[in-house]
Structures are given as C-alpha cells and as structure tokens.
Amino acid sequence: MSRSGKSLTKYKIVFLGEQGVGKTSLITRFMYDTFDDHYQATIGIDFLSKTMYLDDKTIRLQLWDTAGQERFRSLIPSYIRDSRVAIIVYDITKRKSFEYIDKWIEDVKNERGDENVILCIVGNKSDLSDERQISTEEGEKKAKLLGAKIFMETSTKAGYNVKALFKKIAKSLPEFQNSESTPLDSENANSANQNKPGVIDISTAEEQEQSACQC
C-alpha cells in the first residue's frame, strides 16, 4: 500500500535474451546501482519487485529475469503471458545474440497475440566499443522492423542509460500517459521522495549516449 492508502499499480516486466547478454546485470544496475564482474547464469526464473517514482506518480515494477539457456525455454512462455513489458536484450559484441531477437519477439507475440504489450530491444555492453559487431543503426533498424516501441543501447558495467531506459519504458505505461507536472511540482516531489527508502526516483534520468530512439 502507498502512504495515501491506495494500492500501487503493478506492472510486470519480463527480460528475455540469450545467455550472457546482461539481463540480470541490467536489473541489478537498476535496482541497486551496482555491477558484479563475476558472471553467474540465471537458473530458471528470478523475480524482483521495486517501487519507482516518476512525474509525481509511484508504481510497483515486477521484474522477471529469465534464463537464456535452452533447457529452461519451456518455462518462459507462462511468464510472458501476463507481462505488460517485454525487454529483449542482446550483446552488441555477439552477433548470434542479435540474430535470436526475432525468435524472442515471436515468443512474445505467440503468447500475447495482438494485446497491448510494450516491446523493447536493448543492445547491452556499449562500453565494449572495440568489440562491437552490431552497429547502433543496425539495432535501430531491427527494432523498427520488429515493431518494438523502444530501442536503446546500454552499458550495465558503466551504468550508461539504464535509468534512462526505465524512464522511457515508464513514459510508455498507461499510468504516465498524458501525465504533466510543473517544474515546481517535480522539485517538491523529488525532495519528498529522496527520503523514502526503497523507492527509485528516475525523474531526472536522461539518456547518456546518442544511441536511443523511440521507434
């Protein structure tokens, strides 16, 4: 329950992609603003929940982290089924992970049909520019072709564009459609939320790289 006594609106976000692309790191960076250099593959499905503040509104995000290994694929459709947002992550240094985006999008569409689900494609590990195999332009083109609403490149290691990604996603949710607040309202609300433990305030998050588009 929120402090006003009203239940927070909850949005389920499912993270999809091949093993090792950085799905867990993306969640960890957003939740705790940390990065773990020691890779551990997700076993099955992990779940985390976080309260997020934006535009004088507070919502609850349910983040579902799925395993990329083939042996866990049979578990994933049931978690896609009632999701509001599907984030498909690929590694910009691994072309194979990029080529599998089509399959993940197909899985989402098979489970969600024509329902209103927000598709996001994220190219992670943008800090590894010397090892890049997929250009930003190629990623943007793929996102538009597959009907993704959001495309962005991130670096969970460096912290680039992670909060900006979630801000862009939040702005696409029904809760924030046509949401307006004055600078004074935002300043006062931001100050108040700084004292709320466990709440992520993304009001001031901005894109840090020229590698994002609203598709």
UniProtKB/Swiss-Prot annotation:
Its main location: membrane. A motif (Effector region) lies at residues 39-47. Belongs to the small GTPase superfamily. Rab family. The keyword Thylakoid does not apply. A lipid is attached at C213, C215 (S-geranylgeranyl cysteine). Residues 178-196 have a biased composition (Polar residues). GO terms for biological process: cellular response to heat; cellular response to nitrogen starvation; cytoplasm to vacuole targeting by the Cvt pathway; Golgi to endosome transport; intra-Golgi vesicle-mediated transport; intracellular protein transport; macroautophagy; protein localization to phagophore assembly site. PROSITE patterns: RAB (PS51419). InterPro entries: P-loop_NTPase (IPR027417), Rab (IPR050227), Small_GTP-bd (IPR005225), Small_GTPase (IPR001806). It comes from Saccharomyces cerevisiae (strain ATCC 204508 / S288c). GO terms for molecular function: GTP binding; GTPase activity. Gene3D superfamilies: P-loop containing nucleotide triphosphate hydrolases. This is GTP-binding protein YPT6. GTP binds at residues 17-24, 65-69, 124-127. The lineage of its organism: Eukaryota, Fungi, Dikarya, Ascomycota, Saccharomycotina. Present with 7720 molecules/cell in log phase SD medium. It is found in: Cell membrane. GO terms for cellular component: cis-Golgi network; cytosol; endomembrane system; Golgi apparatus; phagophore assembly site; plasma membrane. It is a lipid-anchor. The modification Cysteine methyl ester is found at C215. Residues 178-215 are annotated as: Disordered. The keyword Hydrolase does not apply. Keywords: Cell membrane, GTP-binding, Lipoprotein, Membrane, Methylation, Nucleotide-binding, Prenylation, Protein transport, Transport. Protein transport. Might participate in post-Golgi transport.
